[in-house]
């Protein structure tokens, strides 16, 4: 299974909509930057028909060093999670 990259998306959109690669790159970069900024400022991002990027706070917990087996503290942190929407889930399930 192949991986799609940001460059693949830019090239596809540029060809499909007959836009310059530079203009398309700017649109894609700005779109992703808005998502990054929203998450950075503590806002969840909801993309209708696609899914939600949500922030979750994880509390500190004891972890384990896999090499030595020693218990090490894992500090509290904030993580980004993605929850696919119903439409995306349904389409992905059809492709199995």
From Swiss-Prot:
- Which cellular component appears as one GO term in the record? cytosol
Per the UniProt entry, the signal peptide is none
UniProt keyword list: DNA recombination, DNA-binding, Transcription, Transcription regulation, Translation regulation
One example of the protein's molecular function in GO is: structural constituent of chromatin
Q: Which GO terms describe its biological process?
A: DNA recombination; positive regulation of metabolic process; regulation of DNA-templated transcription; regulation of translation
InterPro entries in the record, alphabetically? Hist_DNA-bd (IPR000119), Histone-like_DNA-bd_CS (IPR020816), IHF-like_DNA-bd_dom_sf (IPR010992), IHF_alpha (IPR005684)
Q: SMART domains of this UniProt entry? A: BHL
CDD domains found in the cross-reference section: IHF_A
PANTHER family, alphabetized: DNA-BINDING PROTEIN HU (PTHR33175), INTEGRATION HOST FACTOR SUBUNIT ALPHA (PTHR33175:SF2)
> Its function?
This protein is one of the two subunits of integration host factor, a specific DNA-binding protein that functions in genetic recombination as well as in transcriptional and translational control.
Assembly and interaction partners? Heterodimer of an alpha and a beta chain.
This chain's protein is named Integration host factor subunit alpha
